UniProtKB/Swiss-Prot annotation:
Disulfides per UniProt: none
Gene Ontology, cellular component aspect: plasma membrane
Assembly and interaction partners: The complex is composed of two ATP-binding proteins (BtuD), two transmembrane proteins (BtuC) and a solute-binding protein (BtuF).
Family of this protein: Belongs to the binding-protein-dependent transport system permease family. FecCD subfamily.
UniProt-listed InterPro entries: ABC_BtuC-like (IPR037294), ABC_transptr_BtuC (IPR023691), ABC_transptr_permease_BtuC (IPR000522)
Pfam families given in the database record: FecCD
GO MF term (any one): vitamin transmembrane transporter activity
Organism: Citrobacter koseri (strain ATCC BAA-895 / CDC 4225-83 / SGSC4696)
Keyword annotations from UniProtKB, A to Z: Cell inner membrane, Cell membrane, Membrane, Transmembrane, Transmembrane helix, Transport
Bilayer topology: Multi-pass membrane protein
Protein's recorded name: Vitamin B12 import system permease protein BtuC
Described purpose of this protein according to its UniProt entry: Part of the ABC transporter complex BtuCDF involved in vitamin B12 import. Involved in the translocation of the substrate across the membrane.
Amino acid sequence: MENMLTFACQQQRRNVRWLSSLSVLMLLAVVLSLCAGDQWIAPGDWFSARGELFVWQIRLPRTLAVLLVGAALALSGAVMQALFENPLAEPGLLGVSNGAGVGLIAAVLLGQGQLPGWALGFCAIAGALIITLILLRFARRHLSTSRLLLAGVALGIICSAMMTWAIYFSTSFDLRQLMYWMMGGFGGVDWQQAWLMIALIPVSLWICCQSQPMNILALGETSARQLGLPLWFWRNLLVVATGWMVGVSVALAGSIGFIGLVIPHILRLCGLSDHRALLPGCALAGAIALLLADVIARLALASAELPIGVVTATMGAPVFIWLLLKSRR
């Protein structure tokens, strides 16, 4: 008994150290994001005339959007991996990201490129929520998590095919631009998208507080039922929350891979297996990873900006493979 208490105390101290370190790293990443750009603006110059324009009007809304989207995607990945008992589960797996893309393409086609940005964002959220509602329809038939996962994969394939057909046969310049936007990027984010940023905050905070049901869900369906967890209720609630976060993230920045898949894995390999530490850790680490990727996307080319989805995949895949090989040793 004493050994168990000692182990629990050591694990708690380890979790606190990890979360404290991630918090400090996130603050440093925010400062770097505000300073970096075509012109380096040190913190001492943030309140100058130049800083008023570049830092507070251009870089700050972009930095906040990157931070919130990174946190939301990493949290979505952690939730899906526990919910579906599948280490490969990630935000795009259920078809929610592709559903948001279909909503955007439908808005561009029906609006003939004349709709404002907020309307496109609303259509992306609507597309994501429609896919979520279809998944809930399947869930009401009390399908197992594996069957629900396969249903999400099938919906994602259908939505991807619809987007490909629409873009391939379109001569609209807006749709060509939309294809580039779906690769992920924060270049067009300003304070007009603040409502999308605000829409991410309450759901992300709520997810961070759901460690108890998440720990039970991670044990598997049979154990969760034996422990008295209302599995159908929590599965539906978490699918809706995940659909909302992914839909808003796609509306804000396009489709971004790697974050939701790899960040929860990396933290588990580092010892953060308890969702009381894993969920806030995912939010912090996801924000850090996407902030660093955004800085690289801005600075890698002198005359253009790389799609952030390309940067996250290029950075993340080798790191993930290295961590897996290290853990096997």
